[in-house]
Amino acid sequence: MKNEMWSGRFSGASDELLKEFNASLNVDKTLFNEDIQGSIAHATMLESCGILKKEELDAIIKGLEQVRSEIEQGKFVFDIKDEDIHMAIEKRLSEIIGSEIGGRLHTARSRNDQVATDFKLFVKKSHIELIKLLKELIQTMLKHAKAHKKTIMPSFTHLQHAQPVSFSFYILAYAFMLMRDIKRLQNSLELADFSPLGSCACAGTSYATNRELSAKILGFKDIMSNAMDGVSDRDFALDLLYDIAVIFTHTSRLCEEMILFSSSEFSFITISDSFSTGSSIMPQKKNPDVCELIRGKTGRVYGNLISLLTIMKALPLAYNKDMQEDKEGIFDSVKTAKDSLIILNAMLKEIQINKENMLNACKKGHMLATDLADYLVREKNIPFRKAHFIVGNVVAQAEAQGIDISEIKDLSKIDPVFDEKAMELLNFEFSLNSKQSEGSSSIASVEKQIQILEGFIQNL
């Protein structure tokens, strides 16, 4: 028996294997709210253009709201024979209000533009949700930054001690990464803010519709200017997947350092028991599973981006069934990102900063060497390359004595070019605050950085 809504031109029924293989209902039912939202906007537009009667519009809206209620309450019966959420909702609507009125809803609309509209609405909503979560994470980082302007720790290059910085300066580096993530999402949201609804299959419609009205009802800034582009565009999905991938690049780096810094080799931070797990065999273990899982989930969001890029790379215009595969990766990446940002924020709120361990770690690796070289250039007018060589010799002498250069009692005994003033440089806090360039580790600079981020957050 033929029961598909599109089966009029077919002489036989679809094979059961095809029905199951072709269906996307188990995935795209996530879009039920967006589909109902889009249908109400479309019906409202049709009524304003005289294509639907007022009583027909009222019946359609009432019926769609009943469908929404049934789905939300778990009373809606999803049947894979309905193929997708769009057909499932339309079928149920016709059961509620009758096919004579329900069948008019799809006038001047194709599933091609319907799907694209629903998907865009979901993507737009996801942008806004992710921006909110990133904002909250930045706010947590700012609290740590304000509290730890004088908490000195080593910075690293090549995972070796580089120069002393504050924990405030360190965590602000990640806050600025997240600020860029928000800006990236804002840019993508702006590009996605064009409605494809009314593009129909690919060439528009012969009905005198008002696409601008349905776009306005749905909260879009404008309409897609070309109907063929409207139904075949998935740039908005690619943009979101890329934005999420970059977010995970940043959070994965942070999580990697949280794992390292919480290890017994560093002990810079302590992760709360609330966000740690134990071992099935080793009673002493306290594992940073939150950080490890976020680091691991980075691979799946990268994979979702590559998957959609590959799906779209050679598709002829306009719509192709391949594009049915565009949603699962988005749904997965969005959920993964939201879950990860929420738990990362909760974990960071409770981390303990071990100030003494951080300071003690600064006494390894000769981190004040650059300060000495800069002093020779600035105060003794020595070319930097020569100063670099002189201080390198100081480091060699310190290592020969088994000490850090911060522990040297008299630099002039190693090289007479150093005077008493040079000894003042062998102080981590002095080193921290001696930096004068914009964006540096000094307390004054850190305070400016905090102000920049707070201003950005307030204007969101």
UniProtKB/Swiss-Prot annotation:
Pathway: Amino-acid biosynthesis; L-arginine biosynthesis; L-arginine from L-ornithine and carbamoyl phosphate: step 3/3. It catalyses: 2-(N(omega)-L-arginino)succinate = fumarate + L-arginine. Its main location: cytoplasm. It comes from the Bacteria. It is found in: Cytoplasm. GO terms for molecular function: argininosuccinate lyase activity. It is an enzyme of class 4 (lyase). Its EC number is 4.3.2.1. Transmembrane segments: none annotated. GO terms for biological process: arginine biosynthetic process via ornithine; L-arginine biosynthetic process. GO terms for cellular component: cytosol. Keywords: Amino-acid biosynthesis, Arginine biosynthesis, Cytoplasm, Lyase. Belongs to the lyase 1 family. Argininosuccinate lyase subfamily. This is Argininosuccinate lyase. The gene is argH.
